[in-house]
Curated annotation (Swiss-Prot):
Protein name listed in UniProt: F-box protein At1g54550
SUPFAM superfamilies per the UniProt record, alphabetical: F-box domain (SSF81383), Galactose oxidase, central domain (SSF50965)
Cross-referenced Pfam families: F-box, FBA_1
SMART domains in the cross-refs: FBOX
Native species: Arabidopsis thaliana (Mouse-ear cress)
Domain named F-box: residues: 1-47
Lineage: Eukaryota, Viridiplantae, Streptophyta, Embryophyta, Tracheophyta
Amino acid sequence: MATVTDLPDDLVREIFSRVPLTSLRAVRSTCKKWNAISKYDILGKKAAAKNQFLEFMVTDSRVCSLRLDLQGIRSEEDLIDLSIKQISIPNKVDQVEISQVYHCDGLLLCIAKDNSSVMVWNPYLGQTKLIQPRKKLHRYDKFALGYDNNRNHKILRFLYEGSPRNVIIDVYDFSSDSWRVLDIDIDWHELFSHNSVSLKGNTYFFGRKGPRLPMLFKPPSRRFEYLTLSCVRNEKLAVLYSHLNRFGTIEICISTKIDPSAVSWTTFLRIDMTLINGLPDNFFVHSYATSFFFDEEKKVAVLFGTNRYRGRETCQYYQRACIVGDSGYFKAVNIELVFNSQLQSCQLVSSSYVPSLVQLQD
């Protein structure tokens, strides 16, 4: 009698490509052969291309995964399959509280809340690498994860030395397992704001000063305007333009060409939120879309932010996902209750996560 171990490797790989990434544990526990194949063949390549998104976020000082399936939207049932769960980090570091997470090339850079260490984690392979900083971490430190032209991964750390004009840049090289200091003068205000994205090894962000890449619209000059960065399946940059205290028109642009000193943009979606029927009165009124991603095929964007609900005695915040699209489409889903101190940490740290086979030797 034939079993799953008798299936040809080509057929197994085709099965792997259609199974969602969230089924990885079940696949690996099926048999030793499937477990071995999953270590050098990525699961869910075709499934991920069919309106299924896997993201990561930090909530309650723990790393959580958020899975969102948009295949059922704009249908007769108009179903949205959304789930969030805390995920375990292997190698006995699961109890470490995390304050920040950065993403690049399928890897997650996790910063310990007690500022003791940094850790790089490959969720797909289940591998981690603990890295001791050259100097003790500071809560104002900024980080970026990327790689060079030879695919050597590196960590950039911007050390806050007590003054906005006293910033040191450390670089950790995975290949040499060592830190070095860059001899560069930089003002703290030139560094990235609340969100940044990594695309093909480079990190992009909005800074208050310094050279700007061209945009389709004028960069915000008033305090109530907001720009949020994202990327499209590690292929293109995307930017969301919105208002902080009132939602009028939102605009999403995607890059068509990226050069070292120039980016070409095109408008993907422009929506007048005042024309949407059933839009809640408090829709992102007291916050903003901290992160977002979108589905090019279905012409919808998923905006993540927090909404405040004020009761007679208490005030509560909910992490919310809002799906908006052309022709007035709108649907909102409350994800979970969060505390005020967690609002910044609840933003997504990857846009349409794609697994990686990058080995972490630790």
